[in-house]
Design a protein with these regions (language model features):
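Leu/Val/Ala/Ile-rich N-terminal alpha-helices, chiefly Sec-type signal peptides and the beginnings
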Residues: 2-150, 255-291
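Extended amphipathic alpha-helical interaction segments
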Residues: 124-255
Length: 292
C-alpha cells in the first residue's frame, strides 16, 4: 500500500536551523576566543620555562668551565685532598643544576607540543618556530654539561679513593717494612692489593673521562703492594733469596710508580684537549646560540 512521505514540520526545520546556528556560533567562539587564549596561555608557560632553562644553562656553563679548569691542570688524581672535596661538591651540585635546567627544556617542549596539537589551526603558533631552535641548542649544551659533571664526579670520587690508598702505602705499609714488622706489612699490603684490584675497572670507565695513563699508575701501585707483600712473607719465613728477589722487584715497582705518576701529570693537558675541551666547547657554543 502506497504511503506518501511525511512532511517535515516548520517547527522541526526551525529547530534544526537553530542547532546549526548554535554549533556554528560555538565553533566561531572557540576559534575567536578560546583558541587564542589557550595558545597565549601555553606560549606564556613555554616562555617561562625557556627563560628558566636559559638561566640554568648559563649558570651551568660557568660552573662547568670553572670545575674543569682546575681538574685539567693536573688531572683529577693530581689534585690535593682539599681540592678534591671542594670540586666533588661542585661537580655534584652542577650536575643537579644541569638536570634541573634540562627539565625546564623538556617542560617547554611539552607546552609546544600541546599548542601545536590544538584543533582547528591552519598553522603552528608563531612562538613554536621562534623558540624551538633555542630549545634544541639548550638541550645540546646541557647534555654535554651533564656528561662533563658526571665524569668529574666519577673521576674525583675515584681520585679520593686512590689518594687514600697512596697515603696508606706511605703511612702504614712503608713504616712497617722499615721496622721489619713483616706481619703488619704483609697484612697492609694484602688489604691494599684487594682495594686496588677493585679500582682497576672504575679507572678504565670511559664515562669518567680519565686519562688512560692513570690506569698505568694504578697498575704500578698494585705492583708495589704485591711486591711488598711477597717481600714481607719471604722475610718472615727467612727465605733470604726469595726476599732479595722480592726486594729488587719492589724497588723496580716503586720506580715505575713514580714514572707513571709523572707521565700522567705531564700528559694531563694533552688529554684534556682531546677528551674534555670538545665537550666544554659544545657547552659554551650551544648555550650562547640559545641566548643563555
Amino acid at each position: 500500500m502506497f504511503r506518501p512521505a511525511r512532511r517535515v514540520s516548520w517547527g522541526t526545520w526551525i529547530f534544526a536551523i537553530l542547532v546549526l546556528l548554535l554549533a556554528g556560533g560555538a565553533v566561531g567562539a572557540f576559534l575567536e576566543v578560546v583558541l587564542p587564549q589557550r595558545v597565549a596561555s601555553l606560549a606564556q608557560s613555554e616562555g617561562s620555562e625557556l627563560a628558566l632553562a636559559r638561566k640554568g644553562a648559563s649558570d651551568v656553563s660557568t660552573a662547568v668551565g670553572s670545575l674543569w679548569t682546575e681538574i685539567s691542570a693536573k688531572g683529577g688524581i693530581g689534585l690535593s685532598a682539599d681540592q678534591i672535596v671542594r670540586d666533588l661538591a661542585l661537580a655534584k651540585a652542577t650536575e643537579k643544576a644541569a638536570d634541573d635546567a634540562l627539565g625546564h627544556v623538556q617542560a617547554a617542549e611539552t607546552y609546544m607540543a600541546q599548542a601545536d596539537g590544538l584543533p582547528f589551526q591552519l598553522h603552528s603558533p608563531a612562538f613554536i618556530a621562534a623558540d624551538r631552535p633555542a630549545l634544541q641548542h639548550l638541550d645540546k649544551a646541557l647534555q654535554a654539561a651533564i656528561k662533563l659533571t658526571h665524569a668529574a664526579t666519577l673521576q674525583l670520587t675515584l681520585a679520593q679513593h686512590l689518594i687514600q690508598d697512596a697515603q696508606k702505602i706511605s703511612g702504614t705499609l712503608d713504616p712497617s717494612l722499615g721496622a721489619k714488622s713483616w706481619t703488619d706489612a704483609a697484612r697492609a699490603a694484602s688489604e691494599l692489593a684487594t682495594d686496588l684490584k677493585a679500582q682497576q675497572a672504575p679507572v678504565s670507565d670511559p664515562e669518567a673521562l680519565l686519562d688512560p695513563l692513570w690506569a698505568k699508575w694504578v697498575d704500578a701501585m698494585l705492583a708495589v703492594v704485591t711486591s711488598a707483600q711477597q717481600y714481607s712473607l719471604a722475610s718472615a719465613a727467612k727465605q733470604t733469596q726469595q726476599a732479595q728477589q722480592a726486594s729488587n722487584s719492589l724497588a723496580a715497582a716503586r720506580a715505575q710508580l713514580a714514572a707513571t705518576y709523572a707521565a700522567a701529570q705531564n700528559g694531563a693537558a694533552a688529554w684534556q684537549a682531546k677528551a674534555v675541551q670538545p665537550l666544554l666547547g659544545t657547552v659554551v657554543k650551544e648555550a650562547a646560540a640559545a641566548g643563555a
